[in-house]
């Protein structure tokens, strides 16, 4: 939504408000195989040798592995299963290297991703859906890495006062979307100024 643009609204300690357009997102895709065009584009991106890193912020719950999803084979519905399916496409394209980076604020976030991806890959090998070399590929840290990261700034949900201020300034299409999972997205991000 929002033409892949966002407005950063920086709330300074002096009471000043600084606004900047964030235009670094070039494409938005739904990571769901039932959206066939979006999924085909994701496969194309994962098969591209120029891809060096993927990152996501999905909350700690997003790293879960459910037995029922493991049994779905190469058509998982959970996020980590989808990441593993896309890594399999990268494997088939030449065992290309990739950094898989969690941006979630949880302890050992890279290990959570690695554990989930390895679980899917191992199950798929056991089911005879992928070759054992795929599991070796995602376990080879010279090919696929899952680094830890520390996030020191959490972006709050869209603030109604900031939304009203922007509307008063003439900022149109200033609506907040609440997803099925009760997460919030808006065409603006409100945050306090970095203190250090």
Mark where each language-model region is.
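Substrate/ligand-engaging "lid" and interaction regions
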Residues: 1-196
């Amino acid at each position: 939504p929002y033409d892949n643009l966002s407005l950063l609204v920086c709330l300074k300690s002096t009471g000043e408000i600084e606004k900047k357009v964030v235009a670094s997102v070039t494409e938005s895709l739904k990571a769901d195989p039932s959206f066939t065009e979006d999924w085909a584009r994701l496969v194309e991106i994962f098969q591209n040798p120029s891809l060096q890193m993927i990152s996501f912020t999905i909350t700690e719950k997003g790293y879960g592995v459910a037995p029922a999803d493991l049994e779905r084979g190469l058509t998982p519905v959970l996020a980590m299963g989808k990441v593993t399916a896309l890594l399999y496409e990268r494997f088939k394209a030449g065992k290309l290297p990739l950094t898989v980076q969690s941006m979630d604020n949880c302890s050992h976030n890279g290990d959570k991703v690695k554990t989930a991806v390895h679980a899917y890959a191992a199950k798929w090998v056991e089911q005879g859906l992928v070759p054992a070399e795929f599991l070796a590929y995602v376990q080879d840290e010279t090919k696929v890495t899952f680094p830890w990261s520390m996030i020191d700034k959490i972006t709050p949900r869209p603030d109604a006062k900031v939304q009203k201020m922007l509307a008063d300034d003439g900022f149109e299409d200033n609506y907040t979307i609440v997803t099925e999972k009760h997460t919030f997205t808006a065409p603006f991000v409100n945050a306090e100024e970095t203190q250090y």
